[in-house]
Every structure is written in structure tokens, then in C-alpha cells.
Amino acid sequence: MAAKSDGAAAVAGPGPEGPAGADRGGAGGRGEAAAGIAGPGPVEAGCPGPRYELRDCCWVLCALLVFFSDGATDLWLAASYYLQGQSTYFGLTLLFVLLPSLVVQLLSFRWFVYDYSEPAGTPGPAVSTKDSDIVGAAISTKDSAVAFRTKEGSAELVPRPAPSSAGTYRRRCCRLCVWLLQTLVHLLQLGQVWRYLRALYLGLQSRWRGERLRRHFYWQMLFESADVSMLRLLETFLRSAPQLVLQLSLLVHRGREPELLTALSISASLVSLAWTLASYQKVLRDSRDDKRPLSYKGAVVQVLWHLFTIAARTLAFALFASVYKLYFGIFIVAHWCIMTFWVIQGETDFCMSKWEEIIYNMVVGIIYIFCWFNVKEGRSRRRVTLYYCIVLLENAALTGFWYSSRNFSTDFYSLILVCVVASSFALGIFFMCVYYCLLHPNGPMLGPQAPGCIFPEAPGPCGPPADAITSPPRSLPRTTGTERDGVAVGGERAGTPTLPVFQVRPGLPPTPVARPLRTEGPVIRIDLPRKKYPAWDAHFIDRRLRKTILALEYSSPATPRLQYRSMGTSQELLEYETTV
């Protein structure tokens, strides 16, 4: 979740049809191959890009409903504890609401400050292009400054012309109003609500506007969705997860039927955790054009998967904590340390700096206390199996220790709780298997893999085609004059025409395909290797790159394409283009 690129450069150059030598090669002058990426979503060149649909709008509205229900029930429960005179429960409940919210609002406001700040001495990040063939224009992201260098005789990338005094005054007033509004929104702890509404607005604008503005608004919508998904992931595991364990522990400790308000708070926290995890994975896949998007069916099944596994996990925690409070704290700290070390040992590559990567790994360690979260590239089947085997053993041990120290007058009640833990975990594993076997974007886990984004069909077996001649050529006898004149050879009737040795198969005439005229836009070469899934691309977590890309995309009449520096071996497809 970094905001800096440590001086990485983004270079805008010509497309594949531009001058020779500019379409291949390394970014930053290192002579290394460049990995191509362009905009959100895999689409064919010349075809319309992904559109914002009604179900996308409904998904955002449901996310807002989950957010408000979680916060409102927690605050309502804290007020109930206060009115009942239970100051300890009131303080703990309010602490788990306010402290994570303050942390997330500070991070969100920091992102806003960077996004809306202007470098000294420049009119802002907005730029314009005279033509679409931009040759040699370099955009540096060092120290948040945007500099432009062009070759002589080429199309020029120029800053926006200086506004008049009246325009400057109006612009400053607008900026002041935006700053005051954002400050008020974040003081009211509504930064995420603002980002949800803005993502909804940008998505609707991308549907209603023309082609060029549609792409621009769609990019902005994806950036805003990525921001709010990261913020929600951080907040839910700092607020909803501890709140869920606390309320369940109090419920088990009292040994009576739950009140309606307590049950609502527990349910809202549980749904918030499951929803945030599924929403994060969906936005992450939607943002990468090298991965197939996650369908809404898969997202709903992911919600059910995490809902039941987290419910079993937190109930086991609550049962154990209701009897062994000190040992429960030791267990949580030990589990967090082991999981954090496991994540660090996997050498994740999510952030732009070392210290931010360490902080991120610590947050992932907190997530691993409750549920599975993929942080490493490649097939995760073994890691998922190992993790849930450990969780199963821990849940059984925690529940067993609590059951051994139970009150024997409530045997039936204790047996019901044990069955709830076991059945909830089994249901969660069932929905996980349904997701991986039927609804995974890459295809069934045990069946054939679905076609990828770059290759529409699965590659066939290596070797020559069926019509190819695999045997080496043999020497043919010389054709005599008699044979050329049609004389029978080997008993055939004279005058019978012989078939030619080589034949050309008649083929259908090529059908002319009407291709829409399109202008090649700038190629933005980023002097960084592209991060591998499940990490975010650098232009999503580095806000300098984001500002530069949005400025070029808005000013260019064609879709800009991004190229990351490739650290691996050369591939057949070094550049591929998608429409935003």
C-alpha cells in the first residue's frame, strides 16, 4: 500500500507502428524486454472495453449496506453497555470501533492529500498531446515532479496553458472547497463511504459518456475501487474480527441466550469480514489484465466460504477465551508470529519499499489468525490444504479444552456449541471446494483449465501439424519424355493424364474484415518489473504513476498502453494491447 515508487521512471513512447527500435527493448534504457499491459480487463484490439453494469452498481450498494450495518450495530451495542452501567464492556466495544477507524481515516486522508496536491513549479499533473504519436516524451515520477522532454520535430507533450486570473481564482476556490469537504468527511469517519460513492459515480459516468471519456472514468473507477478495498480489508481485520471474538466471548461467558442487539452485532461483523475478503479478491482480479475476472457467482460463494470458516474459527476462540483468558492471549500472539514468519519466508512483493512490505506482512499475519488469504504466486492448493489442516487441529484443540472444563449442568448446551463449530467449518470447506471445482476463474481445479486472457484457446500439443510431412524427402526418379507426353507407365492406358506431384488446395477467398480506424496512443514504459499476482500492479499502489497515467490517458485521443520491464526470459508476446 505504498505511495512512492522510489524514483522509478515512466516513459511515454510510440506504439508498435512507431519508429523502429521504440516498440521493443527495455524501459529506462537498460535494454531489457518490456512486459505489456494496457488498461483494465482483457479485450481484443478494436473491440469495446469492459462496461460498468447494473450488477456492479448493486455490488457497491451492498458493500455500503454491509459497512453501515457493521458500524451501526457496534455503536448501538456500545451505547447499550453504557446505559446498563457496564463500563468495561462499553470501553472495549468502543475501542475496537474508534481506534481502527482512526487509523484507516488517516491513511485515506494521506492518500487524498497526495492525489490532490500539486508539485511546486508545475501547473498540475494534467498534460495534453498535440498528436497521438508521441516520440521520446519522458515522464519522470521522481519527487512527484512531472517533467517532459521531447525530440525535435516530434509531437510535443506540453503542460496545460496557464489560466487567466479569474480562472485561477475560481480554481483555487474549488480546490479549497474540496479540501474542506474531504477534511470534514474524514473527521466524521466517512472516508470509505465517500470512496464508495465516488467509485459508484465514476462507474456510472463510464457507462454514460463517450468512448474516450468512458475509458478515463473506468480507469478512475478501478483505482478508487482498489483504494477502498484495501482500506476495508485493513479496517475489518482491525475492528470487526476483534469485535466478533469479544462479543462471542461475552456471550459464552454469560451462558444465556443472546440478546437481539448482540446477535445483530455478531452477524454484522461476520458478514463484513466475509464480504470484504470476497470484494478484495474481485477488485484485484478485475484490475489485472493478465488474469480472468472473478464472476459474481464466484464472489458470492467466496462470501459463504469465508462466512462459515470464520464463524467456526471465532466461535472456537470465544469458547476457549471464556475459560482461559491468559492462555488465549498467548495462543493468539504465538499464532500471529508463526503466520507472519511464514508469510515473510514466502518473499511477498506487494509494496514499493521494504518497511511497507514488513508492515503488510504483519497485517497478513493478523488475517491468517482468522482465515486463508493468498499472498504468493502459483498454485495454492498445497498451501490452502496445509493451512486448513492447521486450523482444523487448532479449532478441535481449543473446543476440546473448553469442553473438558465445562459446567456439567449444561451438557446439552455445550454439545450444541461443539456441533456448531464442527458443522460451520465443514460447510465452509464445502463452499471452498465448490468455488475451486466449479467457479474458479481459471477453470475447474480437477478438470481442464479454462482459456487464458492472452491465448483464447488452450495451447495444443507441441509438434508438426496433421497435414505436415514428417518423413525426410526421398529422391524421385527422373521424368522421361514419354511420361511427359502422357504415355502409359506401368500398364496404364496412354493418354490418361497423371496427377501432378504437387497440388495446391483450393481455399476460400479471404473475407474482408472491417476494422475500425484507431490511432495509436502513447506507450508508457515503467522502469519497474511487473508484480506477479496476487500482488497489485505498481500503477495501482504507486500514486505517482497513477497520476501520470491518468493525465496521459485523459489528454491522449487513443488508449495509452503500459509496459513494465520484464525480468524473465523473452516471451513471444512482449506487447499486447487492451482497450480501457
UniProtKB/Swiss-Prot annotation:
The chain crosses the membrane at residues 59-79, 89-109, 260-280, 303-323, 326-346, 355-375, 384-404, 415-435. GO terms for cellular component: plasma membrane. It is found in: Cell membrane. It is a multi-pass membrane protein. Its main location: membrane. Pfam families: XK-related (PF09815). Keywords: Cell membrane, Membrane, Transmembrane, Transmembrane helix. Residues 1-22 have a biased composition (Low complexity). It comes from the Eukaryota. Residues 1-35, 470-492 are annotated as: Disordered. Belongs to the XK family. PANTHER family: XK-RELATED PROTEIN, XK-RELATED PROTEIN 7. This is XK-related protein 7. It comes from Mus musculus. The lineage of its organism: Eukaryota, Metazoa, Chordata, Craniata, Vertebrata. The gene is Xkr7.
